[in-house]
Structures are given as C-alpha cells and as structure tokens.
Amino acid sequence: MRPGRLRLLVGLGNPGSKYVGTRHNIGFMALDKLAGQKSVSFRPQTKFHGLMAEVGVGSERVRLLMPQTYMNESGRAIRAAIDWFGLEVDQLLVLVDDMDLPLGRLRLRAQGSAGGHNGLRSAIQHLGTQDFCRLRIGIGAPGCTSEERRARTVSHVLGVFSRQESLLVDQVLDEVLIGLDLIQCLGLERAGNRLNAFQPEGCSAC
C-alpha cells in the first residue's frame, strides 16, 4: 500500500454488549480508540451491515467500519462498502485478532491466507482474493498443547482481558494508532518495520 492510499479501515469483531471487551473484538477496540482520538462517532449503516465513522475530508477521507454481521459473515459488510464507495482492494486494511501471536505483538501484512480466522476467511471469500492488507493483533493462545488450545479456543477468544492484560492492550492500541498514521504517511513497508518489531513495556512473554 502506497502512502495516502488507505480509504477503508475495517475492525473485525462480534456485535452486541455480551462481546464488548472480548479478545475476538480487539479490532473493534482499535477502531473505537481511533474514533475517540479523532472525536468522531459511529453510526448504523444498514447498506454496509455495520457501524461506520469517517475521519479526514475530501481525498484524505478514511471510512472506519465495524461489521455487525458476526465474525463469520464479516466479508459481506466489507464487500458492500468496497462496492458502494468504488474502492480497490488495495485501499483496504483489516484489523483482526490473532491467537498465533502473543499478546502485545503485531504483524502487518500486504496479503495472506485466513490462517484459521473465520472473519478473514469470510473477507477472502467475498472479495475473491487474499491480496488485501491486514494488521494482526496478538491475543495469545490458551493452554500449552495443541489439544488444550483446541479445547479452550472458544472460551479464550470470547473471554475478556484480565486487568494485567488490559495494561498491555492499552499500549498495543496506542501503537496501532501510530502505525495507522505511518501507513498513510510512509506506506505499508515502512510502517511494518516499526509495527512488526513492537514490544510493549513489561511484557516478558513477547
């Protein structure tokens, strides 16, 4: 993604109060933090199956979208917004949780597979390509073995962060916002050099 190319920023998560603050909703949390920083509000947009806010004006405008379709159907909302605004897929960035990354780590990529994530799988299906940018936000994995991980995946991603974890999440989301500015100013590669090396203070497991 070239500097200034980003036009649609999508955070993945599940709608409803029961999912607020859960690990699976860290994409929503990032957009909420950005909206607060920019003093903008999300409004329901039925044609996009989600909540939308806008930052910037004119040719610098970026839409923020939180699909309200539940995670497994996130791609419907993304496709609807891409089509409505006449955007190209390379103007899209998706913010998504990732169990394969420790809590506190970030991975910015220009493309890639779903990696077992249902929201990304839906996006790839509806867009017809996996060549879109995504920022994976680590939430860590439960258990020490593959069997434990499989048994505890649902409770882990739908669970809320502990108080200690929330301190790390605050640092991570601050870094995400810095990274989004860098993507617009410097492009994906240079922003990735910083984001992919990020390590929050006080995180020995990172």
From Swiss-Prot:
Primary location: cytoplasm
InterPro entries (UniProt xref): Pept_tRNA_hydro (IPR001328), Pept_tRNA_hydro_CS (IPR018171), Pept_tRNA_hydro_sf (IPR036416)
Top-level division of the source organism's lineage: Bacteria
Compartments (UniProt record): Cytoplasm
Binding site for tRNA: Y19, Y70, N72, N118
Family, as annotated: Belongs to the PTH family.
Descriptive protein name: Peptidyl-tRNA hydrolase
The encoding gene: pth
